[in-house]
Structure formats: structure tokens, C-alpha cells
């Protein structure tokens, strides 16, 4: 059962669902809009060897960032021209990880799904790849996987980037996501790189 605007407000007002910060104007008919935070990660790897710790760079923006498609030609001259022309803080090509401003806490009988806003789909920017599902009992900020597929897109800190759709489960989970021993991204308060290498470590322990 998907929660309506009335349900979302009831769950938030009762404290069963926590969204911090919460903005009443971001409640849609059956969703809640979330905003883009200031923290990002780009990887330094030529090849993603998922058995290993992936080298990455973390950074923050003051105002805006330009996301370019992977094969969009960039050099220092072009980057400086973009920065000057569009008054942006940073220019990146290829995929990058971002995060929501919102810290979300779900009870064991509510799960959620993240979807990018359709307005961004219309400029061929995707803000999640495969990680749109949020298990019941999750606590943390939502990490975003951001890719531009056509032309460069400028994103602004604190703008609405996507939405959460909440669903009520038929029965509560025995152990919520953030209480599971093997949960990799529980209680994340910032953008997090892939921790898939832990899958191999856990397999060895078992």
C-alpha cells in the first residue's frame, strides 16, 4: 500500500517516519521531494575492481556543479570557460555520487523507493542507477548515482532532485535494515562510495 499525502503527514507528525529537514511544501499526492546536498564523490579508477577498495575523491560545492556525459571533451581551458560563463563551482564528466540533504528514518513496516524527478529525465539526467530501493528500518541519507546522458547539466545545491514513495508492508520486518549486522550503508550521514568489497569479506567469514 503506497502512502498518500495524508498518510505521509500522519506518519511524520506521529514520529513513525522521520524526514529531517522536513518541508510541508515538498509533500506530493503520494510522494515526498528530496533535495540535493553539497557533498559529492568521484572515483579515480580506470577499472572498477569490486573486490577492492575503490579510490575516490570527496568534495563539496558552495552553489552549483556541472555534470557532463562521460565522452564529453573536457580540458582545463574548457573547464575554466564553463566556470566563468555559468558561475559554477565544479565541472565533472562521467558518473558521480551525491547525497540528499534529508536524513530519513523508516520503521520496520514502511519501505520506500527513490525516483528522480521527471523534469530531470526530460534533460536526460538520471540521479539513481540501480539503488532506488530503501528497505524498511533504514536510517540515513540517500546516496545518489548521478549521470548525464546527453548534454552537460548544471545542478544546484538544495534544489529538489528526486522523490521518495513510501509503502506500508503487510507485516513488520523482524530485523530492519539499520539493525542488520551486514548492512553496509546504515546511518550514513554523508555520500558513501560503493562498499561492495565487503560482500567478499562476509563470504569469507561465512
From Swiss-Prot:
It catalyses: dCTP + 2 H2O = dUMP + NH4(+) + diphosphate. DCTP binds at residues 117-122, 135, 143-145, 163, 177, 184, 188. The active site is at residue 145. The keyword Oxidoreductase does not apply. Coiled coil: none annotated. Gene3D superfamilies: 2.70.40.10. Keywords: Hydrolase, Nucleotide metabolism, Nucleotide-binding. The record marks 132-133 as: Important for bifunctional activity. Pathway: Pyrimidine metabolism; dUMP biosynthesis; dUMP from dCTP: step 1/1. GO terms for biological process: dUMP biosynthetic process; dUTP biosynthetic process. Its EC number is 3.5.4.30. GO terms for molecular function: dCTP deaminase (dUMP-forming) activity; dCTP deaminase activity; nucleotide binding. It holds the Pfam family DCD. InterPro entries: dCTP_deaminase, dUTPase-like_sf, dUTPase_trimeric. Belongs to the dCTP deaminase family. Homotrimer. Bifunctional enzyme that catalyzes both the deamination of dCTP to dUTP and the hydrolysis of dUTP to dUMP without releasing the toxic dUTP intermediate. HAMAP family: dCTP_deaminase. This is dCTP deaminase, dUMP-forming. It comes from Methanococcus vannielii (strain ATCC 35089 / DSM 1224 / JCM 13029 / OCM 148 / SB).
